[in-house]
């Protein structure tokens, strides 16, 4: 019984150590730049970014954990366009996997996972509209006080995620949108 207690205490200590090493998202801004087929573009914005990541315990360069965006909060600045975006294209009411965009298995390239700082690139698994695909993009990580400020950008090809072509009265959004994210993380 004594050895079982020691194992449980060791596992609890390891879990606490990993949790203490986690980077937790604080304030964040997500902008999805949507280029229009007739020229110009509009932004869909939200601050509903959450999550935490931890350097992988397995020694992999990828982080454990994930970052998530509540797609029900995306705002384009026009009520009818918001309704069409959420109901007709993202279909957020279909539930889990549709109401949230999640980035996981984030692998920083050119930056140390233990003390990331500077410019580099990343790869990760993005789940949107119930579909998971690899995305890659640029990342810039800067130390700010006791935490980090992260900015990242990456393209998303809407047909890859089985999202219908956004069209209304002959005007539409091109297939590829650009996601720009800025957020703070602390331990």
Predicted region positions:
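Bacterial N-terminal signal peptides
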Residues: 5-14
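Low-complexity, acidic/polar, glycine-enriched regions of mature
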Residues: 19-187
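Hydrophobic membrane-targeting and insertion signals
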Residues: 3-5, 18-21
